[in-house]
């Protein structure tokens, strides 16, 4: 695994995202992700949680899989990542609303190594064809975005979230929650 000193991380932050400095504990979180450590992040809205998986995805080999509950949020994240790159294939999402041609294009971009971030709803991630596809892909890490929804909306919300753990051995949770006690309910 590559080592990234603080100076290099700051250089890459500027190069990829145009920021001169990290917010709060972003750098420590990013370093943990780069070192392959499971990481649970508590940050307020606007705290920069997304960058905590976006920058490592850009720096690591393979594609980062981001599990998100809302298609609109996935689309916003993909659109934002594409503004930072000249390659529209840098980020994609896969969901049930896509036609076969669009799914094939996304999968092709992933297999060619163009895609660094691939977003799924939990229902899409747990579909057998997507599980089979991901077995062919070098995955850099997994992130669960907006995991607080599991706690706030109850464990009956999106039962597919319970099926993620058997599919993924190590899950990186990047979440927005207001109280640490929810960690126990989410896990």
PLM features: residue spans?
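Conserved helicase/translocase P-loop NTPase motor core
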Residues: 114-130
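Conserved pre-motif I regulatory segment
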Residues: 2-42
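Hydrophobic positions in the central parallel beta-sheet of the AAA+
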Residues: 41, 66, 118-120, 142
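Conserved nucleic-acid-binding Ia/Ib motif block in the N-terminal RecA-like helicase ATPase lobe
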Residues: 65, 71-119
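SF2 helicase catalytic motif II
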Residues: 130-174
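Single conserved hydrophobic/aromatic residue that forms the stacking wall/gate
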Residues: 175-187
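Walker A/P-loop NTP-binding motif
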Residues: 34-35, 47-63, 80-82
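Pre-Walker A (Motif I) flank of P-loop NTPase domains
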Residues: 35-41, 62-63, 115-116, 174
């Amino acid at each position: 695994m590559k080592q990234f000193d603080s100076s290099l991380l700051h250089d890459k932050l500027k190069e990829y995202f145009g920021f001169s400095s990290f917010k709060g504990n972003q750098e420590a979180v990013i370093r943990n992700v780069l070192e392959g450590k499971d990481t649970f992040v508590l940050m307020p809205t606007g705290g920069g949680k997304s960058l905590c998986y976006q920058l490592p995805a850009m720096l690591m080999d393979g594609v980062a899989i981001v599990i998100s509950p809302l298609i609109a949020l996935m689309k916003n994240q993909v659109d934002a990542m594409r503004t930072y790159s000249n390659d529209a294939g840098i980020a994609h999402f896969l969901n049930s609303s896509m036609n076969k041609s669009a799914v094939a294009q996304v999968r092709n971009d992933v297999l060619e190594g163009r895609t660094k971030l691939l977003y799924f709803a939990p229902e899409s991630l747990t579909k057998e064809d997507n599980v089979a596809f991901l077995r062919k892909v070098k995955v850099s890490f997994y992130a669960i975005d907006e995991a607080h929804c599991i706690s706030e909306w109850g464990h009956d919300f999106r039962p597919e979230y319970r099926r993620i753990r058997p599919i993924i051995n190590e899950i990186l949770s990047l979440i927005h929650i207001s109280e640490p006690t929810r960690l126990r309910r989410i896990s």
